[in-house]
């Protein structure tokens, strides 16, 4: 399998002197149901540190939508203010939609995923949204009919649900599982784990050589989602395909964690937010 070598793609993100925030794209992140607002906040902060021009959080927990400590740059909308999710996407007009961090699995979550799948722009799907795809065939059908391949970022458990198999089977042959996920969804897929794998229709599978056990902590995947969404948004005007943005996000995320561990920050106690900040340094270097 080909080694992931995507870091040089970051050179395409260099800002022109006359650049404005619109050039770096608008990211919409959907999730943050009650008790899970932190997942969406982590993804949002990661999007900021990864260079998104605008970052909008659509928070399903209305109470949490009014509290964003230490990150006033985030524009937070309560999902309850939008009775029609499809119209919300039209109104917000994002360049990229990322859905899943803290989304939940109830009917409200399903309605927002249906709207995201009907939207025709760049799409990143993670966490609870992947479980909804696995348990609702009509959502998987909608994903396959999306006008362009979405980027999916399952961990082994989510991958097992998508393929109706076991976590053990996924881990026993991760390369085969990646190929099966790509074929099953017709999407770009990041199979997370030790040395994450990246695959896509018509692309040679790639393996990330970076990463460490300190990344095995809740919220680390949310940071990857935010980073990927931000790079995908910038890529629209900086000539990065969604597959390229995905590869760059995976490697920058893992390298950021490795750099921190090399500095003595972890592996025990390494936090997702520390990785999000370090991603900024990786991209700019």
Language-model segments: which ranges?
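Small-residue (G/A/S/T)-rich helix-start motifs and N-terminal tracts that mark the onset
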Residues: 1-124, 131-151, 156, 160-285
